[in-house]
Structures are given as C-alpha cells and as structure tokens.
Amino acid sequence: MANKLEITLTKSVIGTKPAQRKTVEALGLRKLHQTVEKADNAATRGMLDKVAHLVTVKEI
C-alpha cells in the first residue's frame, strides 16, 4: 500500500444521494476537479468505495 492517495472529484455530486454528498465533503472535496491528498488507510478506502463513481484515485 502507498502512504498517500491523491483523490480528485471528477463527477458532480448533483443528483447523488445525501450520504454520498457527505462522504465527498468528508474527503475534503468541494469543487469539481479539486484534488486532495489523504492517508491510505481503511477508513479512507471505505469512503472511496462509496463514491468510486465520482472520484479518481492515484497512489503516491
């Protein structure tokens, strides 16, 4: 496993379920094409599984 993940919001949260919107917000993403770095751990991976269709993930 890599130490960090680079997460980019690639699809809009308009029309998604409220739980998915909160997950995207919890990841620190607000705007389209915004990128954040998060630690690679089980909690982050779980959140990414819930919104995999909205984000792209790159291991760094």
From Swiss-Prot:
Q: Name one GO biological process term.
A: translation
The UniProt subunit note reads as follows:
Part of the 50S ribosomal subunit.
Q: What is the disulfide pattern of this chain?
A: none
Keyword annotations of the record:
Ribonucleoprotein, Ribosomal protein
Q: Which GO terms describe its cellular component?
A: cytosolic large ribosomal subunit
Q: What is the lineage of its organism?
A: Bacteria, Bacillati, Bacillota, Bacilli, Bacillales
Instruction: Give the family this protein belongs to, as stated in its UniProt record.
Output: Belongs to the universal ribosomal protein uL30 family.
Show the Pfam families listed in the entry: Ribosomal_L30 (PF00327)
| GO MF annotation list | structural constituent of ribosome
The gene coding this protein: rpmD
Name the source organism. Answer: Lysinibacillus sphaericus (strain C3-41)
What is the name of this protein?
Large ribosomal subunit protein uL30
